[in-house]
UniProtKB/Swiss-Prot annotation:
Residues 795-823 are annotated as: Disordered. InterPro entries: DNA_mismatch_repair_MutS, DNA_mismatch_repair_MutS-lik_N, DNA_mismatch_repair_MutS/MSH, DNA_mismatch_repair_MutS_C, DNA_mismatch_repair_MutS_clamp, DNA_mismatch_repair_MutS_core, DNA_mismatch_repair_MutS_N, DNA_mismatch_repair_MutS_sf. This is DNA mismatch repair protein MutS. Keywords: ATP-binding, DNA damage, DNA repair, DNA-binding, Nucleotide-binding. PROSITE patterns: DNA_MISMATCH_REPAIR_2. Disulfide bonds: none annotated. ATP binds at G613, P614, N615, M616, G617, G618, K619, S620.
Length: 857
């Protein structure tokens, strides 16, 4: 709104502020409420389910309005942030008693989903990330910031496919993109995508701002000096963070250069299919993290989630973690550490709030307790001989001076906010103690003064009192007023009484009337000074928090290794993946019966397993457990297997199950083929590929053809491949592809009921047991019986299975006798011959047809 002259002074003030934030809800402080006006009010009333009303008129129109009590702000903010909304907080900074016109107000902070830091607005076990993008279809610069921890990273990524996979991994709640980008690009379809002015991404300005933030001459020390696109994106994030926080950001101390080549890459589909930290229903139960996360602190849980979503290919780091877990298992040392780590709490986010200068009293109390627990924890860490654990111990340190300061300053159980005082201990500051004593002991002072004055004057009817209009006074009946001492100054005449004040009472009044407000102001000033002291130690404290989080994760993995019977995998140079008695870490915990462990062997002689067997036989579980074992090995964890020997992999692909993409206009089969295409384009001889039922979403012939060709291609790529299928024709692949072998999940039938044995055995399955599974699922008996009739007719009418290549050698497992779908297709020449009407043909036509038929052979 540009013309404000027709509005009231208060609404003019409102619109001047609102016009600076047109796309965000504005909470406008008025007394004890935050008021919300105009379109913001209509939107907020609907989102928050609060009453929409009207407040007078301005510019000739009534003002739509709703409001919330100031002390209930956090609950409403949490709801709005969860809905993806951003909120501008506008506070009164002027004094209503001295203001002429509207009380002065200003925006003090902006709450957005990606920049919240308040504990009540965050999921303590999840990173809250904001990202920014710059680039074109060939190369992108990506910057990622977690304002609640200070983690700040950049990378450059080639192509949309890799970029979208990385966005799926980090899952930012906000994504900033330049406003001059074309509309409807893939990145903009993500929830939380917001456009920013192109100059926010200016690379020169970004470089200058980042160097200023980190107090460096250039960015070479961070290894990202030449990543100009990523630097532009990082500059945008820094600007956005400062704009929303309205304060310096001392907890942002460095920039980390991440490289895709350092990690095992998982695309979005693979991440979802493996249910690492989110299950297929969108929840957290029965995920890998739900099984292996018993961390004592929330900051360690977040670190473990990052490890799971970014497995490493750095052998040195992985072996250091393995050595650390062994050390912690030795003598069950983790059992001593874990209770001590629990005392540390989530100091990572506490320190971030201190850096943002919005830490609350209970944050400081928790930091006090954490620092107090450090010496005992350090003593325990000193006994850990593993080199990596020794490095973590050296980083952690102790902070006796800060611990002592917080112990002297903060009461044992402080209130939630500093607003009403009562946070600092008695004895911390003499002036504050005096002010509080005046305020708290005013009643006793008046009683004592009255007793002293009665004794001094001999006037038994003398009273000391107070009212809001005239303040403190000494009251005497009119008859005794003439006997008042000379230092009594007349203040008020009443019917039947006179009121006086003395220099002593006046001095007390001046102190008492302002003591409470002065005490609050003094306590707030001391609290802010305490925050500044902590900020000056922020760098080593943050390093300690990071080290303690990693120690917690490693202790957790040691505990899980013991209680889940996990063993240390061995990385080797020879390309291989050998698993002895492997188990699915999640399914094993859910089952009420013992899990059937299975072996797997892939190396230079066998790169692909064709897996056949009945539905529910365990094919998908076998494939998923393989991927999870490989992934756990690549975070440095022990794995659910008796033994495991593997080489480093570069990517993990899964094509397991599909659902349609209605919003994107893609059918189930289209989604399946898109995932398959991604695998065939990007898999290498270092990739692990899981393919489950490829081709089932289309006609039988098309599906089999695609599955066969995809399997051949993967065999030629030499990728480590597990290929589950119900197309038994594929079991002849080992005859033409020497790197392919057959295995099957066994089952048996007893009294016409199927029994799944879940053992993986060499060779192809003998039958699919499809009707038995259908019966087990509760398909009506008449339907099952009719299906048996159809099956019998189909089996007798199809041509016998023909071998695709030369006969197998004696003793080798045989492919099941099943009709060859390709063999059962009529030859075009036979099909055409069957349609001829020989009686209507002339000799010449017959000769021409013979030539045509010959050409078809």
């Amino acid at each position: 709104m540009s013309d404000l002259s027709a509005h009231t002074p208060m609404m003019q003030q409102y619109w001047k502020l609102k016009n600076q934030h047109p796309d965000q809800l504005m909470f406008y402080r008025m007394g004890d409420f935050y008021e919300i006006f105009y379109e913001d009010a209509k939107k907020a009333a609907k989102l928050l389910d609060i009453t929409l009303t009207a407040r007078g008129q301005s510019a000739g129109q009534s003002i739509p309005m709703c409001g919330i009590p100031f002390h209930s702000l956090e609950g409403y903010l949490a709801k709005l942030v969860k809905l993806g909304e951003s909120v501008v907080i506008c506070e009164q900074i002027g004094d209503p008693a001295t203001s002429k016109g509207p009380v002065e107000r200003q925006v003090v902070r902006i709450i957005t989903p990606g920049t919240v830091s308040d504990e009540a607005l965050l999921d303590e076990r999840r990173d809250n990330l904001i990202a920014a993008l710059l680039g074109d279809e060939r190369l992108f610069g990506l910057a990622v910031l977690d304002i609640t921890s200070g983690n700040f990273s950049v990378q450059e990524i080639k192509g949309w496919e890799n970029l979208l996979a990385e966005l799926e991994r980090i899952n930012p709640v906000e994504l900033l993109i330049p406003d001059d980008w074309p509309r409807d690009l893939p990145a903009e379809k993500r929830p939380g995508a917001r456009r920013r002015a192109p100059w926010d991404f200016d690379r020169d300005s970004a470089r200058k701002a980042l160097c200023q933030q980190f107090a460096t001459k250039d960015l070479k020390g961070f290894g990202c000096d030449k990543l100009t696109l990523a630097i532009g994106a990082a500059g945008c994030l820094l600007t956005y963070a400062k704009e929303t926080q309205r304060t310096a950001l001392p907890h942002l101390r460095s920039l980390r250069h991440e490289r895709l080549d350092d990690t095992v890459i998982l695309d979005g589909a693979s991440r979802r299919n493996l249910e690492l930290d989110i299950n297929l229903a969108g929840g957290r139960d029965n995920t890998l993290q739900s099984v292996i996360d018993r961390c004592q602190t929330a900051m360690a849980s977040r670190l473990l989630t990052r490890w799971l979503n970014r497995p490493l290919r750095d052998l040195k780091v992985l072996q250091a973690r393995q050595d650390s877990i062994r050390c912690l298992l030795d003598g069950y040392r983790f059992e001593k550490l874990q209770p001590q780590l629990k005392e540390i709490g989530d100091i990572e986010r506490i320190l971030a709030r201190i850096g943002l200068r919005n830490a609350r009293p209970r944050d400081l109390a928790r930091l006090r307790d954490a620092l107090g627990a450090l010496p005992e924890l350090q003593n325990a860490m000193a006994e850990l001989e593993a080199p990596h654990l020794a490095r973590l111990a050296a980083i952690t340190g102790t902070y006796p001076e800060l611990a002592s300061l917080l112990e002297r300053a903060i009461i044992d159980n402080p209130p939630a906010v500093i607003r009403d005082g009562g946070v600092l201990k008695a004895g911390y500051d003499n002036e504050l103690d005096d002010l509080l004593a005046i305020s708290e002991n005013a009643g006793q002072f008046l009683i004592d003064l009255e007793a002293r004055e009665k004794a001094r004057t001999g006037l038994a009817n003398l009273k000391v009192g107070y009212n809001r209009v005239h303040g403190y006074f000494i009251e005497l009946p009119t008859k005794q007023a003439e006997q008042a001492p000379g230092d009594y100054i007349r203040r008020q005449t009443l019917k039947g009484a006179e009121r006086f004040i003395t220099p002593e009472l006046k001095a007390f009044e001046d102190k008492a009337l302002s003591a409470k407000s002065r005490a609050l102001a003094r306590e707030k000033m001391l609290y802010d000074a305490l925050l500044e002291t902590l900020i000056s130690h922020l760098a080593p404290l943050q390093d300690s928090a990071a080290a303690l989080a990693e120690l917690d994760v490693l202790s957790n993995l040691a505990e899980r290794a013991l209680n889940l019977d996990l063993n240390c995998p061995r990385f080797v140079d020879e390309p291989c993946l050998r698993i002895d008695q492997g188990r699915h870490p999640v399914v094993e915990q859910v089952l009420t019966t013992p899990f059937v462990a299975n072996d797997l062997g892939l190396d230079n002689s066998t790169r692909m397993l064709i897996i056949t067997g009945p539905n529910m036989g365990g094919k998908s579980t076998y494939m998923r457990q393989t991927a999870l074992i490989v992934l756990m090995a690549h975070i440095g964890s022990f794995v659910p297997a008796a033994s495991c020997e593997l080489s480093l992999v570069d990517r993990i692909f899964t094509r397991i199950g599909s659902s349609d993409d209605l919003a994107g206009g893609r059918s189930t089969f289209m989604v399946e083929m898109s995932e398959t295409a991604n695998i065939l384009h990007n898999a290498t001889d270092r990739s692990l590929v899981l393919m489950d039922e490829v081709g089932r979403g289309t006609s039988t012939f098309d599906g089999l053809s695609l599955a066969w060709a995809a399997a051949e291609r993967l065999a030629q790529l030499r990728a480590y491949t597990l290929f589950a299928t119900h197309y038994f024709e594929l079991t002849v692949l080992p005859e033409s592809e020497p790197l392919v072998a057959n295995v099957h999940l066994n089952a048996t039938e007893h009294n016409e009921r199927i029994v799944f044995l879940h053992h993986v055995l060499p060779g192809p399955a003998s039958q699919s047991y499809g009707l038995a599974v259908a019966q087990l699922a509760g398909v009506p008996s008449p339907v099952i019986q009719r299906a048996r009739e159809h099956l019998g007719r189909l089996e007798t009418s199809s041509l016998p299975h023909e071998q695709a290549v030369s006969k197998k050698t004696k003793g080798e497992p045989q492919a099941p006798h099943q009709s060859d779908l390709f063999a059962s297709l009529p030859h075009p020449a036979i099909e055409k011959l069957g349609k001829l009407d020989l009686d209507d043909m002339t000799p010449r036509q017959a000769i021409e047809m013979l030539y045509q038929l010959k050409n078809l052979l």
